Amino acid sequence: METTSIELGGVLIQAPVTSGTNLLLAVQCAVYSARLRTDAEPRPRLWAGFFAMMSLATLAGVLKHGLRDTLPDGAFLGVLWISSVTGGVSTYYAQLATIRSHARDATALLLSRAALVQLVVFLAASVGLGPEMTLLIADTAIGLLPVIWFEARGCPEGGWVAVGLAVSIGTAAVYIARLSVGPWLNHIDIAHALMGVSFLLIARGARAAAPRQEGVPWS
């Protein structure tokens, strides 16, 4: 893949479009997190945690792509760790938001513990293997595919979340196919645009707390 760069204030910024779209995503997620955090209901507050983690992950992406040849090796590794760990924790928050919305107390407790076990396994595997993207993708798929299914069935608001998460996971196809318009709009940039749409949809569905009703999937 052909690399691009610009110089800002004497600092060489590599992949400026990729870094810039990461920054926009970080701001977008931070705004959603701040808005949802003020809600009294647990569902939007947990989705606020999801967006807070995604804001940190995408902010780390600014450094990972923009300063990858400028940062010292130790600092760059730290950025990779932040990006990976926050991505895993964001999946955990998404799981909790769905569990607390659609499951009753005993089931919710059991599923919450299962989600915590998944997070611990992911973190332990990351310590052993390092911040591997393949590991993060696997953890995300295992955690979010059930979330998509239950959000789609649980309440009207959950449909927005389900579609948003499906779009987010669908960006993997863009990465695999390496869909690109050119060096200044590569497959990562296109994936970032789709992620922006994904976050918009998730935020719309997260604003309203889903009631626990008889007959919902996890009752």
Which ranges hold each PLM region?
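Polytopic alpha-helical membrane-helix bundles and their juxtamembrane interface segments
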Residues: 1-54, 62-219
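Conserved phosphate-interacting/catalytic interface
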Residues: 59
